Amino acid sequence: MGGLGALGVSTTAYGFSAPVLRLRVARYNISPPKWPAGLQLRIAAIADLHACDPWMSLDRIQEIVARTNALKPDVIVMLGDYVAGHRQVTRYIPASEWAGVLAGLTAPLGVHAVLGNHDWWEDKTVQREGQGPTIAGRALEAVGIPVYENDAKRLSKDGHPFWLAGLGDKLAYMPARRFRPLRRIGVDDLGATLAKVTDDAPVILMAHEPDVARRVPSRVALQLSGHTHGGQVRMLGWSPISPSGQQLAYGHIKMNCDVVVSGGLGCSIMPFRLGVPPEIVLVTLGAPRPAVA
């Protein structure tokens, strides 16, 4: 069985490696309503690493770190799902190892993170006990990367303040068929998160699942999300399979606030991508030019 498993991974690698391992930068230039004049903010976002060999190796993560730093963003956000959930792997990379590589990310206003559903789902202790912290969250905090769970922090650039907020994951707990019944599904609290914003400076919201955008008020300037992988298959602007629906499958969407959904970097279910290569997102806020995908 071990030999057959290795053969299966090898065959999959042969067929799917090119689109899975390609890496691009998706750039968006956005001017939200009421964005402060004179504040131009460059945000690099990475999402859905799903760290594992051979698809998202430590060398691959190091490449992503180097490419992200080379963009010279003002701030870096990480949008969850660092942990792999699919089974076509030769090794699940321990959290301490991938977090150690992510510690190389650097930006003047820091590196900030939220967790995704797989960071919760693959932590069996958390699922059994019904509470965190997760292994993934502890690993990030250990290397100096703050993990936001319904929290907000006031930052400033060029004398202009803004808020960076992070939502707890809305799908943190798996269905009871795998673990003991829980009375809650998520750890998200949008109201409590926004209540921590204490002035009228603009708000940027990190939320792993984009679905929350339907409830996010116009008080928020920008929501940044991952989770969907752009469907992993995307043709002519359409994703046949998207856990958050077609409207929120990928890209820049105008709702109550501007929403950018990353296509992510890793894979879920199967190591396969078509029409939506792995990407780092770079959002420039306060730039008058139109968005470029």
Label the predicted regions.
Residues 36-146:
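Membrane-embedded segments
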Residues 204, 209-290:
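Conserved beta-sheet core of the metallophosphoesterase superfamily
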Residues 1-17:
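N-terminal export signals
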Residues 31-44, 145-146, 152-166, 254-259:
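Beta-strand-turn-beta hairpins that frame and shape the catalytic cleft
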Residues 123-145, 157-203, 213, 273:
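Binuclear metal-dependent hydrolase catalytic cores centered on His/Asp/Glu-rich metal-binding motifs
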